[in-house]
Amino acid sequence: MIRKQTNIKNKKLALDFKPSMTALSRIMQTMIENGSECKTKLSLDANLNYARLVRHIVWLEKKGLVESKVEDNKINVVLTENGKTFASTISGISQ
């Protein structure tokens, strides 16, 4: 079985997409608390619609704040070092 590697350049995002600060805050807070997770579990834990979560994850990937990694046959979303800084900043603002 040949597995295609996902490339951030291939991921599409609407040009007029503006991320919700509330959604970003929920995603970041959940990732700080739970570490790397697959998108389905992350959407459940952050209490966000899956499609909405995916749009925000693509935006975060394009900004270099998260990256997708294959772990245990699952694609998990992981915070980068810049993402950890952003997460602590946005979590402090939302509280």
Role assignments for model-derived ranges:
Residues I2-I27:
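Short alpha-helical segments that sit at the start of domains
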Residues Q5-K9, T85-F86, S94:
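A compositional/biophysical signature of low hydrophobicity enriched in polar/charged and small residues
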Residues R26-N34:
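Short amphipathic alpha-helical elements of helix-turn-helix/winged-helix folds
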Residues S36-D45:
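Short acidic, hydrophobic short linear motifs in intrinsically disordered regions
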Residues N47-K62:
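Short amphipathic alpha-helical interaction segments
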Residues E61-E71:
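A short, conserved structural fragment
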Residues N73-S88:
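Basic, amphipathic "hinge/linker" alpha-helix immediately C-terminal to the N-terminal HTH DNA-binding motif
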